Amino acid sequence: MTLETIEIETAPKPNAAVIWLHGLGADGHDFEPVVPQIVRRGERAWRFIFPHAPHRPVTLNGGMSMRAWYDILGLDRTAAEDTAGFRATDAEIRQLIERETGRGIPAARVVLAGFSQGGAVSLYTALRYPERLAGVMALSCYLPLPGRLSTERAPANDGAMIFMAHGLADAMLPIALGLASRDTLKSLGYAVEWHQYPMAHSVVEAEILHLREFLLRVLP
């Protein structure tokens, strides 16, 4: 299945792409407003791609159907994870990356980004993708299926530029989950740029400024 997407180009003939995944229950429109805050029109020739997650039943939501990248069985660190859901979504995100390479943007000029569920997927795909990516921005999320990463990781992205951010007052995904994920990544040799902010499960202006700095650095 090809995901429906929203695209914003900041200048003609984009030479880089940012594929940005929304959180649980949201859609691709959720992060459209951040584009002009991150890059001024004409400053860089970037293509922002905001896919819509498909609708699926979510166990944590009483089995109700909503836009989700994978099923959530529980928020406890010991809860089972939807391995099949991650793999299916991973295949869809890879299609988006390959669509960009087909349009002339090499994988090394592609950043994967995401918030909450979308951030977890971005980490999952970026660290397993067989070609070097420009980086990954994982916001208010966690590292999924950490026990599998050591055997499934792609050497091409061992040096991946990873931006992680979390809210100190996040009651939905407590910052302890983000910190544990950061520490796991570091223990596996990944370099993580970590930021934390006095916010809940959201995004704040200071974070957007740091995202801008990160993107300007990895997509010069």
Each model region followed by its residue ranges:
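C-terminal catalytic histidine-bearing segment of alpha/beta-hydrolase fold enzymes
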Residues: 176-220
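Primarily recognizes the serine-hydrolase "nucleophile elbow" in alpha/beta-hydrolase
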Residues: 106-157
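Serine-hydrolase catalytic machinery in alpha/beta-hydrolase-like enzymes
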Residues: 1-111
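Short alpha-helix in the alpha/beta-hydrolase fold that links the catalytic acid
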Residues: 31-36, 150, 174-184
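Alpha/beta-hydrolase-fold catalytic nucleophile elbow
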Residues: 52, 113, 139-140, 165, ...
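Alpha/beta-hydrolase fold active-site loops
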Residues: 16, 160-161
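Short beta-strand/loop motif that positions the catalytic acidic residue
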Residues: 163-166, 170
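Short, conserved loop/helix-junction motifs that constitute active-site signature segments
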Residues: 40-43, 153-159
